[in-house]
Amino acid sequence: MQGFKLAIDGPAGAGKSTVCQKLSQKLGWEHIDTGAMFRALTLYLLENKIQIQNEQFLNKALTKVEIVYLDNKIFLNQEDVSLKIKNYIVEKDVSVIASLPAVRKKLLTLQKGICKKIPYLIMDGRDIGTVVIPDADLKIFLTANITQRALRKQEELKKKGTQMEIHDIIEQLKKRDYQDYHRKLSPLQRSSEALLLDTTKLSIDEVVMQIQDLINKKTSPCLK
C-alpha cells in the first residue's frame, strides 16, 4: 500500500480532534487539524487588528503569515501558538474569518500541499472530504446531538480554566453551525461518500475502534 488518506469532517464538538489525535498515536500516522490552522490565522488577524472588510489590507496581511504544523503543534510565524489559539475570543471569531475567500484560498493551498507530502495522513475539518482531499481513501462525517457537543465544549473550557453556562455554549454552537453550513465557500457538508458516525453515546475509545475497523476493511485487501 502506497499510502492512506483519511478525511474526517463534522461540526464543532463532535470529537474530531480528540479522535484523530488518538488514531494518530495508535497508527503512527500524521494528523493535521485544519481547524487549528484557521484559528492560528484568526489569532494573527485579531492580534494585528487587521481590517478584514478591507480586501487590500487583508491580502497584504496574509502574505506575512506563515503557518507550519509540526509534531502536533501549530506554529504561526515560527511561534508555537498551540495554546493561544484555544482561547474564547479566537473560537468566537474563527467561523467568520474562515468564511473569507482569501483566507480559505491561502489555507487550501497549504493543506493540499501537505496532502501531497505525507503518505499516511489523518486530516480533520469542515471540508476535507469535499474540497481538500476529494479522493481520500476513507471519508467519515462525525456528528453528535447539540447537547452532547455542548457538554464536551464545556468540559474542554473547564480544563482551560474557563467557566461557561451550558445554554450559552449551545447558543454559540447553533450560531457556529449556521455559519459553517451556510457560508458560500466550502460550507460544512457530508460528502456523498462519507460514512456517518454519530458519537453522541460513544466514548472516544469506541469511536477510535470503529474507525480503525473501517480502515482495516479498506486496507486488508492491499495487504494480502
Swiss-Prot record:
Gene3D superfamilies: P-loop containing nucleotide triphosphate hydrolases
Recorded coiled-coil stretches: none
UniProt-listed Enzyme Commission number(s): 2.7.4.25
Chief localisation class: cytoplasm
GO molecular function ontology, one term from the record: ATP binding
One Pfam assignment: Cytidylate_kin
GO terms for biological process, alphabetical: nucleobase-containing small molecule interconversion; pyrimidine nucleotide metabolic process
Intracellular or extracellular location(s): Cytoplasm
Annotated binding of ATP, by residue: G10, P11, A12, G13, A14, G15, K16, S17, T18
GO cellular component: cytosol
InterPro entries: Cytidylate_kin (IPR003136), Cytidylate_kinase_dom (IPR011994), P-loop_NTPase (IPR027417)
Domain of life of the source: Bacteria
Keyword terms: ATP-binding, Cytoplasm, Kinase, Nucleotide-binding, Transferase
Catalyzed reactions per annotation: CMP + ATP = CDP + ADP; dCMP + ATP = dCDP + ADP
Protein family: Belongs to the cytidylate kinase family. Type 1 subfamily.
Alphabetized PANTHER family for the sequence: CYTIDYLATE KINASE (PTHR21299:SF2), CYTIDYLATE KINASE/PANTOATE-BETA-ALANINE LIGASE (PTHR21299)
Protein name, as recorded: Cytidylate kinase
